[in-house]
Swiss-Prot record:
It catalyses: a quinone + NADH + 5 H(+)(in) = a quinol + NAD(+) + 4 H(+)(out). The lineage of its organism: Bacteria, Pseudomonadati, Pseudomonadota, Betaproteobacteria, Burkholderiales. PROSITE patterns: COMPLEX1_30K. Its EC number is 7.1.1.-. This is NADH-quinone oxidoreductase subunit C. It comes from Burkholderia thailandensis (strain ATCC 700388 / DSM 13276 / CCUG 48851 / CIP 106301 / E264). NDH-1 shuttles electrons from NADH, via FMN and iron-sulfur (Fe-S) centers, to quinones in the respiratory chain. The immediate electron acceptor for the enzyme in this species is believed to be ubiquinone. Couples the redox reaction to proton translocation (for every two electrons transferred, four hydrogen ions are translocated across the cytoplasmic membrane), and thus conserves the redox energy in a proton gradient.
Amino acid sequence: MASKIETLKANLEAALGARAVSLVEAVGELTLVVKASDYLEVAKQLRDDRSLGFEQLIDLCGIDYQTYGDGAYDGPRFAAVLHLLSVANNWRLRVRVFAPDDDLPIVPSVVDIWNSANWYEREAFDLYGIVFEGHPDLRRILTDYGFIGHPFRKDFPVSGYVEMRYDPEEKRVVYQPVTIEPREITPRVIREDRYGGLKH
């Protein structure tokens, strides 16, 4: 008898065919990678196909792969990652779609398929700059209206570009260039023989 994850994998392979760029099992979970051009069609099938039945999107986030792993990442830089749940079949799936353009990352919005994607897509847009084409209200959700850049991108400076403070003379909040001096972080050396006060 096949396990749930084997059954799901077989169902996905049968339903999606060549539209599944990759389908990998790791740590008891399946990750499906699809092209941005197939993303909406695949998402609808994941929801509507009874052999799959992913009626609920439980999470969506952005990822910046600029420096992934041990060095520079070779593939596309930005991806949107969805976590789907099938209550009827009691299984989960991770779906990853890469934006084809690193300079202006655009992927289709899945708000019309799973309305719970609304604020998740806004968050990924705000923090990573991933544009979700077709989103009904794509604007910042966590950062300030005048915020410059996208703070979760790996090339965004840790201290940011501007800082905000209250100016008592102007009696309002003002923006000014960052006054924090850059500092070099020296890694702490851990001596295994004396770590945590323990003697070996």
